[in-house]
Each structure stands twice: as structure tokens, then as C-alpha cells.
Amino acid sequence: MAPPKKTVKKMDLTSFLNDDTFGSSWAEEDVDLNKITIPIETANANTIPLSELAHAKNNSNNTRSGGFGGSFGGRSRLDPALGGGSSDRREEYPVPDAPPYRAVINNIPWDITPEGVQAWVEDGLVKPEAVEEVVLPKNLRDPTRLKGNAFVTLKERADLVAVLKFNGTKLNERTVYVSVAAPRRGGGADVDWSSARGSNFQGDGREDAPDLDWGAARGSNFRGPRREREEVDIDWTAARGSNFQGSSRPPRREREEVDIDWSAARGSNFQGSSRPPRREREEPDIDWSAARGSNFQSSSRPPRREREEPDIDWSAARGSNFQSSSRPPRREREKEEPALDWGAARGAQFGKPQQTKNTYKDRSLTNKKTTDEQPKIQKSVYDVLRTEDDDEDEEAEKQNGDAKENKVDAAVEKLQDKTAQLTVEDGDNWEVVGKK
């Protein structure tokens, strides 16, 4: 079953704001501030004794300090609102009777220069060259900015007294305050500690800190700094026992090194270092040529002469049939076939039509064709790169080939002569073998 539809009533914004069905807005109700109460819990910790209030009042009237008084500059340690007025005032120093006569000018402009401060002081005194030195300390966190004060050293005491009258005057439309600078301690840097309370400046010669009443500042239960304890002379003999012997005995003497006879310790056959050191062996002069063989040639032979690089015409060497122009091309030698009388060598039956002989004849013709059809040796394109040594080797091979050919020709001629002397006669006791 479907849930029943909710009835929705539409109204405009004005009707909605003027609708008081559920009451008016809580923001329009008037609140009586006098009826608002704040509960305050009373405890012993929040109760301030009257005697302590009177003591804090007296300290606020009688104590002067440069930042921290007997009770935080005249305020109560429990509630600062119960104390008197603030006593954070700069300490005033008297005019010194001996140099240096230094004055401090506070709240100077940020864009002032030492020359500007010197001119301002001398113009006020109407006395040129009255200023001896001007120092403008810079901010440690930002060295590009000044710290806000200047230390002016004057040559005469009367000028310092006159400069103090410039207090509260204008310097570049800015009110400045002039006072006697604190005396230097140990030749340290010029630091205005009253204006540098919140800085992290650490000078070389820091001024002595004022004697502050830290006990009143930290509470009644605060204990001051511990004093250094004196070293107690303890009787260690009683602590160590009745049989302990003090340090009255003389110190131990150093033991002398014993000269040990290591030869006896190492054995009866040990020989010490008394024998002379071994002499170095001389290297024998070995005849390496005899050791390497009878055919070895030493390096005393003259160096090989450098070969002259031939002037190669590479443009002419691009073709396959390139022939060097330095010498005529070598002609191919044709082998001379000896004229043999094969008829006399083969017998009386030579020339008859026989199948076997025809077969051998065809084979001999084939071998002859093969010999005739052997490819001729062609010169390579790189034949031009051959050097003189290659030519010499080629000439030697050529001579060896000619000698071998001459030997073959002589053997063939000898065989021909012997073959020519053969005769096939019936009376020569030749046996004819026929087919079976």
C-alpha cells in the first residue's frame, strides 16, 4: 500500500517572515545584561594575602629597573593589574668628566646616514667639526636596515651637554630622543640595551647585567643560583679499609727490557745475523743466438728500406679491364703440344674400326676440348695495388714454372724417342690376346 501524500503549502517569502504561528524570533528579544551572572570559584590559590599586596605596592613605588623590577616592574607576581604603574624607563647616565663624550640618539629615521647625523648635530651646535665619530648600528636580522639609534662621540664635554638639549626635537620630520650613552665596558661595541631587549644581539664586550630581584619575579619559593661547592678532602683510606696503604710508597720504577738470547730459544742450529749478507748474483751473459738456433739472425741487420708508395691513378682503375700503364700487359703463354706418333705406339691394329677404340678416342677428344675450354686467367681490378715485392715473387714463380715445364718437355721427348723405337712385328714374340 502506497504511503499517503503529504500536503504541501506554498507561500511567498513575505508571508513566511510575517508568520507568527511558532512565536517570534529569539534574536528580536531584549536581553537584560544585568541579569547575566558569571560564577566565580573561590579557592585558596586565587586568594592574595593583604600583606603581600602591601609589599607589592611598596616595591612598585620604590623599585626602579631597566626592564625587570623587583616584582616585574612594580606589578604583582600574581596579578599584574594590582600593581602600580610601569617602571620600564631608560636609565639616565651622568655626563662624564673624561672622554669619550658620547651621546645616543634614539628613534632616528631609517634612511639617515652618518654624514646626515653629523651635519644635524653640528648645525644644532653651530660648531663645525664638533663631532668626532658617528656610529649607526644595523639590525642583525636584516643588515640592510638600521637599528633605530645612533651613537655620536663629541670632542668636548660642553658639546655633549649642549646636545642633550636636542631631546624631543625633529630630525627629518621625526622626533628623536637624545641622552648620555652608557659607558663602554672593555672596549665593546655600542649597544643600546634598553632598546635591544627583544633582539638576539651578542656583542664582544657585553655590559654587566643589572642586579635583578629574581626571587620576587619567580615566586617566593624560588631559590637563587647554586653556589659552587668546595671540593671535600675525603679520607679514602678509611673508606677502603683498615689494611689500605696510601700513596706514601714510591712509584713503581719502569722495568728494563730483558736482553733475550733468541739463538738459544730457536735451537742449537740457529745462526744469528753475524754472517755477512748475501751478495747479489750477477746475471750471466747468455748467447741467445745459439739458444734460438743456427738460423737465427740478430737485430744487427740494417733496417728495411721504406717502400715508395706508387702514384696510383684511381680514376683509370674503376673499370674491370684496367691495365697498368707502367708495364705492357703480360701475354698468356700457350703450351706447345708435342707431336707424338701414337700409331706406332698403339700397334699394328691401330686404325681399325673397333668400338672400344672409338670410345677411347671420343674420351681423348673430350679431354682435349676440356683442356682447350679452360677459362683464361683475368687480371683483377686490384692488380694496380701490387708492389715491387709482389712483382719479384711473381717473377720467381714464373721462373720456377718455366723450369718445371722444361723438365716435363724433356721427359715427354724422352718418352717419344723410346716409343718411336718400338716395332710391332710377327717375329718379335708378341702375343695377341683375343676375346674368349
UniProtKB/Swiss-Prot annotation:
Region Disordered: which residues?
56-98, 185-406
Q: How far does the signal peptide extend, from start to end residue?
A: none
State a single Gene Ontology molecular function: mRNA binding
Question: Which keywords accompany this UniProt record?
Answer: Initiation factor, Phosphoprotein, Protein biosynthesis, Repeat, RNA-binding
Basic and acidic residues bias: where? 329-338, 359-376, 397-406
Extract the Gene3D superfamilies matched here. Answer: 3.30.70.330
Q: Which windows of the sequence hold sequence repeats?
A: 190-210, 211-232, 233-258, 259-284, 285-310, 311-340, 341-350
The organism's superkingdom is given as Eukaryota
User: Where is the region 7 X approximate tandem repeats?
Assistant: 190-350
**Record-listed Phosphoserine modification sites:** 65, 71
Gene Ontology CC annotation, any one: cytoplasmic stress granule
Q: Outcome of mutating residue 150 to S/C, per the record?
A: Retention of function
Q: What does the record list as GO biological process?
A: cytoplasmic translation; eukaryotic translation initiation factor 4F complex assembly; formation of translation preinitiation complex; translational initiation
Domain called RRM: residue spans: 101-183
Q: Membrane spanning segments where?
A: none
State its role. Involved in translation initiation. May be the homolog of mammalian eIF4B and be part of an RNA helicase. STM1/TIF3 is a non-essential gene.
Query: Other remarks on record?
Result: Present with 24000 molecules/cell in log phase SD medium.
Know the name of this protein?
Answer: Eukaryotic translation initiation factor 4B
This chain's source organism reads: Saccharomyces cerevisiae (strain ATCC 204508 / S288c) (Baker's yeast)
Source organism phylogeny? Eukaryota, Fungi, Dikarya, Ascomycota, Saccharomycotina
**Chain's gene name:** TIF3
